Amino acid sequence: MMQIDMDRIYKNMPLEKIPWNSENPPEALVELVESGRVKPCKTIDLGCGAGNYAVYLAGTGFEVIGIDSSPTAIAIAQKNANKKGVKATFLVADVLGDLDEVTETFDFAFEWELLHHIFPEKRKKYVENARRILNSGGKYFSVCFNEKDPQFGGSGKYRKTSLGTILYFSSEDELRDLFEPYFFIEELRVIPIRSKFASHLVNYVFMERK
């Protein structure tokens, strides 16, 4: 997806109608935090959107930076943090670029439903960026649509959404091949989730930087 496409969505569509925008953090992320598997630390939310998950983490003691290619989303995210009274930093940055805007390194990086917006030929650059900004032993958590997800026509690797965006649906093997050169994969499985408007099957990948 191009930056202008994402910014167009945030500019022209109410937040409550954006399918991936949820004020409540996903159960899988909450579980990582509440179990102590990921403890409060320096964290980056890759493709943070309106910043809801970054705000949640900041409220539980994490030092969080959120980045997104959409300037409109970043402005909304900062307002959300201010409204909730938490300290979080939000930057306009393209995860497929050089990430010069990100001058720090982190102990935890995560993306929730970002990777399926990135086509296979561009994923290596993204994963290299994610690894580069993590400290040695840092954790990385990725969730993206699985190829067996029943939504958006229910078949095909590339599927068009009602917003006009095109998503790529990955298999577990594809993600293993993508991540293993850069990360130790601690957990890779397919889980069901409930999003705002539909149920999905997603790839859940929890890793440690090599």
What does each model-found stretch correspond to?
Residues F110:
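A conserved beta-strand element that flanks and buttresses the S-adenosyl-L-methionine
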